[in-house]
């Protein structure tokens, strides 16, 4: 065939292929118009954290025996434990305990291996500050319990879509005597 005719045929095929791809993209876009939005309006709506969420670490000063297991299992040797040995009771006395959340990777090893369970993970994830030195929490700041977002009337809590689907399936699968 003539080269000009062949060029027009390939141009026509390319045009048809491009139109098909644009049409498929448009159909995909239109199929998403009826769905609920995935994103949330963050400061006013907060999602409920999962059950084993690893947030800020809570510390109980009275339970700590200053064994420093948390420092040894931490991949970055993060917790700073200051103690002194009391000769009369032959035991370590904890003086200061601090964690720098600007460096912490929230792995949870310190919580997992603590023999007295004085460390626990909370659901608090809002740790942002303007000064990174404010992220260095001492034992007083670590012992503060997080504020529950469930009781705050100014914040609307939103369940994860996977949690709501599981709860819907459980409710639909449960049968009562009258549901035969």
From Swiss-Prot:
Keywords: 4Fe-4S, Chloroplast, Iron, Iron-sulfur, Membrane, Metal-binding, NAD, NADP, Plastid, Plastoquinone, Quinone, Repeat, Thylakoid, Translocase. It catalyses: a plastoquinone + NADH + (n+1) H(+)(in) = a plastoquinol + NAD(+) + n H(+)(out); a plastoquinone + NADPH + (n+1) H(+)(in) = a plastoquinol + NADP(+) + n H(+)(out). SUPFAM superfamilies: 4Fe-4S ferredoxins. GO terms for cellular component: chloroplast thylakoid membrane. It is found in: Plastid, Chloroplast thylakoid membrane. Coiled coil: none annotated. The keyword Methyltransferase does not apply. The keyword DNA damage does not apply. GO terms for molecular function: 4 iron, 4 sulfur cluster binding; iron ion binding; NADH dehydrogenase (ubiquinone) activity; quinone binding. Pfam families: Fer4_7. It is an enzyme of class 7 (translocase). It is a peripheral membrane protein. Binds 2 [4Fe-4S] clusters per subunit. Its EC number is 7.1.1.-. Residues 55-84, 95-124 form the 4Fe-4S ferredoxin-type domain. [4Fe-4S] cluster 1 binds at residues 64, 67, 70, 114. [4Fe-4S] cluster 2 binds at residues 74, 104, 107, 110. Its main location: plastid. Transmembrane segments: none annotated. Its cofactor is [4Fe-4S] cluster. Gene3D superfamilies: 3.30.70.3270. One of its GO terms (biological process) is photosynthesis, light reaction. NDH is composed of at least 16 different subunits, 5 of which are encoded in the nucleus. Belongs to the complex I 23 kDa subunit family. NDH shuttles electrons from NAD(P)H:plastoquinone, via FMN and iron-sulfur (Fe-S) centers, to quinones in the photosynthetic chain and possibly in a chloroplast respiratory chain. The immediate electron acceptor for the enzyme in this species is believed to be plastoquinone. Couples the redox reaction to proton translocation, and thus conserves the redox energy in a proton gradient. This is NAD(P)H-quinone oxidoreductase subunit I, chloroplastic. It comes from Hordeum vulgare (Barley).
